[in-house]
């Protein structure tokens, strides 16, 4: 299994992924915070269900592809674990309602993570608008020039069926999504471009860029949405 790391000065870089590289990343992060510079003790699992069965954890952080957020969150909430889930909270409105109800029943602490909203720039923008420093805001334009959204796309499902990379449990990765053969068009990273797995540019980067606008201007829920495309 591989994952893609993005270096804005050098472009895309492909690195090994999977259970063991993830474990080493966690251990090196903790080691950097210790005077000894060493840390061992992170147990890595392939299946989140096995983790929840075996480990007496207090909280769960979910940072998986969009289409699996809800099923993992529900499994954790049923065991009354605190949950921190990255945006978007779920893949659909129906899932969001289910997760919200489960959280109420569990009586635990939950939060949707959005680092775009948590950064200092978002706070500064909100303070500027609240202070009236730029007057009344009547119109907002938000766009993205993120290069990873211009990576190769497909008009339909690719016909090739290459072998599943070593270390990748493809059935587990698919989770609740309709089954399809593995292809690098879906994973890693570009699952965001497919409706069965991701929520598109709006759900991916829009959650970061639009959240500050909605919060600063106290807009509430959208009343209408219009979309257009060139193809």
Where do the protein language model's features map onto the residues?
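N-terminal glycine-/serine-/threonine-rich beta1-alpha1-beta2 phosphate-ribose binding loop
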Residues: 1-81, 85, 94-109
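Short loop/turn motifs at secondary-structure junctions
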Residues: 38-40, 56, 133-136, 221
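Short, solvent-exposed loop/turn elements at domain surfaces
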Residues: 54, 149-151, 181-183
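Residues embedded in well-ordered beta-strands within globular domains across many folds
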Residues: 61, 138-141, 174, 226
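A contiguous active-site-proximal alpha/beta segment in oxidoreductase catalytic domains
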Residues: 67, 82-86, 90-172
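Alpha-helical packing segments of well-folded alpha/beta enzyme cores
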Residues: 72, 95, 121, 209-212
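Rossmann-like dinucleotide-binding domain that binds NAD(P)(H)
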Residues: 163, 167, 171-231
